[in-house]
């Protein structure tokens, strides 16, 4: 077997059970991985120097194909209401079949850290079949120094083989595509998909399992810090603006997607960003655009011009979920330490396509826990067929697919941390105003940024608030530079009766969704629920 690159020779592929490999490329950097990806026909080059790959059938994660070993370790610690199980025997069969499938291959290996805090990070080794996958995970996780590589002993091992096909009968899975995690052995197996996001989210899921035991709240959020050291956390589901809003030229970016919050403050799990890039423009998101159009960026499913090879970020013909992965260093004001102090503000982002939520509201700690457990946004389906009814999406803790433990574990930790550190909490609607999707319009990003700036710099503490009659939270009545009518959503609707009907409908959706959590929270959190009785009749 031919091995090239730097690694711990005393802890090689044999420790994982890999054998009869043709070769291993250890800890290659971007130039070498570009060369292999292009030579192997895995990807093409954009005119700006980005590596552009097509993920084939899977253009997003496949949560229905994700499984966890149910054994003595996980039986009483996993949230089985939100996770699918396989037996230890089925996982072992899958593991052995992965090892067999890898024989004769040349693999790419990366030794990386999941987590910027040395106390809580997890040493992660990732074997990939594809060179561009190796570059992706090297970009997304945190890269050790060369001296650290020579003594690196992994705690978590992940193997990613897109050409592998699972056997549902033999392996206990649903299809030929599989993501399987064994927490006891700290092994992740990914097969049948080229969508690179499965790798990063598997590491995230692992951290979500282990960190609560160590007093750290793992979060699906972005984070930044102001010039005075004031840290802000942004929760939100895909498409709500986590990445866009945390990339603020006046604040230092900690990270765009995954963080831990513990006794010493906030730390990034990653060393890169993974931004949605449909409709990406230099005008609206200059930093992300610049990071996505340069050497070292990895673009997924982005269409290139046939002759000029320029990325067409407006073209969603392959998928609306086009992605750009780039190192944090590509953002001019990013923190390279990935660490910051205790948060002063927590922001929960919701893209409300019903158009009835205010652009910003202040939450009590109990309301914050309620909305954290709810994890609301709304999706708009079938855009190309005209106006359709928005679909509410409730993803608990703003990351249901990545939660191994019961949501109340994370919810209670958040509430305790908010109270302990006297954190201000805000709900921000980045969705629609002036009507439901189809009649209203998207909340202007300039308005959202102005409101966020006022919240983060403390200006909103000194304004007058009203109580929203449907949702019960506090809403500012006026703010310099922001049209006052946009702060009260009913005033933006021409049909006030339709607003009332729509708002009541959304309140009912919140109540129906939260019913499953009511037994796990106290009376104060239950009382924080939206209630149509509050609304003016």
Curated annotation (Swiss-Prot):
The metabolic or biological pathway listed in the UniProt record of this protein is:
Carbohydrate biosynthesis; gluconeogenesis
One molecular function GO term is: phosphoenolpyruvate carboxykinase (ATP) activity
Query: Which positions bind ATP?
Result: 201, 220, 236-244, 285, 323, 448
Indicate which residues the UniProt annotation says bind Mn(2+). 201, 220, 257
Subcellular localization: Cytoplasm
Any one GO CC term of this protein is:
cytosol
**Keyword Ribosomal protein on entry:** no
Q: Which UniProt keywords apply?
A: ATP-binding, Cytoplasm, Decarboxylase, Gluconeogenesis, Lyase, Manganese, Metal-binding, Nucleotide-binding
Question: Its principal location?
Answer: cytoplasm
Which reaction is recorded as catalysed by this protein? Answer: oxaloacetate + ATP = phosphoenolpyruvate + ADP + CO2
Which cysteines does the record link by disulfide bonds?
none
Cofactor(s) recorded for this entry are: Mn(2+)
- PANTHER family linked: PHOSPHOENOLPYRUVATE CARBOXYKINASE (ATP), PHOSPHOENOLPYRUVATE CARBOXYKINASE ATP
Tell me which family the UniProt entry assigns to this protein.
Belongs to the phosphoenolpyruvate carboxykinase (ATP) family.
Protein's UniProt name: Phosphoenolpyruvate carboxykinase (ATP)
Gene designation: pckA
